[in-house]
Amino acid sequence: MFGKLVRPGRPMSSGVRELMWRVLRGTSLNNYSAAQLRFMHLILCKMYNYALNVLLFRETLANCACRDDCVLGRKVPPEIWRLVYDGCKEMGVTDEMLGEERRRAQLWMHFNANRALLEGLTNYVTHRLGVTHAVSVCSNNITDGNYLFNLGSVLPSRILMSIAYCLVFWGRQECEPWVRHFSSKVFILYLMVSGHLRLEGSFADASAACGYQGVVEVVMRDMRGYRGVEGPVAPGGEAPPTDTLDYLFVFNNNVLF
């Protein structure tokens, strides 16, 4: 058992197990081995793709059969449309194509029939956000007729922006405390969704007793308490510069919100 509410699932390698306990202890990323840093970075990239596709699938179901642009665009910040516009211009789309409704419809039909074009546009947008790895989108998500609305709705989500923060500021010493904080939760979430950690049936009751904290936070606290692992203690003066934290809220300046 890893905790009162957490038990082992799929077998994990000794390296992953060692990294798990390092994460729970809050060990500085500076003390990770090169292999552990590469693996953690890989997990961040994979979890970004995973979270993006899960959220896209949720939006696909929620917006199914909806053709009202006002409804579809209710959660899309204007900045996203600017990035999409810039991406279209980079791909050779002219203002004439975008200025007439009939041409826009034909352009979208062409994009929707060519998955590679939408993948390129998606990666252009994520690259502009600082996420430079190849972002892959499942075929059932990217071929949806409302894909651009769905993409614009989910990119500002907290989980994606938190993972993106880790990827954008990876390797910057002044940002290490926050990168470590976010990446530790992403890593434990990875262990849960991959089946390495399984939760007991009483987990919901325990979460309610703790004031409905996040699932990952409750799991980490339970594992630390069960094994007597001391959690991270942030010494004074370790906080990263505030300008980097602004990245998390880059889409929060929409007056409509």
Curated annotation (Swiss-Prot):
Record-linked InterPro entries: Herpes_UL79
Pfam families per record: Herpes_UL79
Similarity comment: family membership: Belongs to the herpesviridae UL79 family.
Protein name according to UniProt: Gene 18 protein
